Amino acid sequence: MAISLKRNRFFIPYTNLVFFFFLCVSLLDKTVSIRISNQISDTVVDSPDRPLKSAVFALGSFWRSEAAFGCINGVVRTSAGYAGGTKTNPEYRNLGDHAESVQVEYDPRIIGYRQLLDVFWSSHDSRQVFGQGPDVGNQYRSCIFTNSTEELRLASTSKEREQLNTRSSIVTTQIQQLGTFYRAEPDHQKFELKQHPFLIQLIGNMVEEELERSALATKLNGYAAELCPPRIQKHIDSRVNEIIRKGWPVLRDI
């Protein structure tokens, strides 16, 4: 017999329910840490001989935008932030003319800018005017921020192709040169992941700065939002359920 925790999409065997209850209680104690380092690697992958590239996109709320790129193979880290405006040091409640954006750090040996553009187009409605979904306002506009002439060429070509797909409506996506990308406040980083405290426990209750830079947290952020490609979503499901079945190992920090 299995009981589905629909909100979190995991299945806990009936025999582990008592354990799960005490585990939930332990979540209140920040000294408790549950790690799955043997299950999912969080190896640092950027180094001088393996440099990462970055790209910045705006496609609505940065909570969901960050999650949309998190599970893509070759994407190492993501950060929610603000770009495209003139205001210095924007904040969530006072961002001026900036757009909520996501900075994507990726390994160019695994994924290219063209593939990131494909994710961008497939993850939002580029024809919606003055907002995205239920979020209305200029801060939720669709925009590609380019870092080079080559990125500008690829972005422009992809926009033309997107427009040809539907001639009955106009693609509203802007393309502009990236100025300064301002990282958003900590509360907005890995937002989807933070809605699932037990996933935070699984990776060891990282401090905020570590969580923001974690490749593992980046993947789990996409997973928590159910935005991973089906194969990856299923793979992480099985890993998490395996840990649950075995009885999560609890390590207490001293």
Swiss-Prot record:
<keyword id="KW-0560">Oxidoreductase</keyword>
<dbReference type="InterPro" id="IPR002569">
    <property type="entry name" value="Met_Sox_Rdtase_MsrA_dom"/>
</dbReference>
<dbReference type="GO" id="GO:0008113">
    <property type="term" value="F:peptide-methionine (S)-S-oxide reductase activity"/>
</dbReference>
<dbReference type="GO" id="GO:0033744">
    <property type="term" value="F:L-methionine:thioredoxin-disulfide S-oxidoreductase activity"/>
</dbReference>
<comment type="function">
    <text>Catalyzes the reduction of methionine sulfoxide (MetSO) to methionine in proteins. Plays a protective role against oxidative stress by restoring activity to proteins that have been inactivated by methionine oxidation. MSRA family specifically reduces the MetSO S-enantiomer.</text>
</comment>
<comment type="similarity">
    <text>Belongs to the MsrA Met sulfoxide reductase family.</text>
</comment>
<dbReference type="InterPro" id="IPR036509">
    <property type="entry name" value="Met_Sox_Rdtase_MsrA_sf"/>
</dbReference>
<protein>
    <recommendedName>
        <fullName>Peptide methionine sulfoxide reductase A5</fullName>
        <ecNumber>1.8.4.11</ecNumber>
    </recommendedName>
</protein>
<dbReference type="Pfam" id="PF01625">
    <property type="entry name" value="PMSR"/>
</dbReference>
<feature type="signal peptide">
    <location>
        <begin position="1"/>
        <end position="33"/>
    </location>
</feature>
<dbReference type="InterPro" id="IPR050162">
    <property type="entry name" value="MsrA_MetSO_reductase"/>
</dbReference>
<keyword id="KW-0732">Signal</keyword>
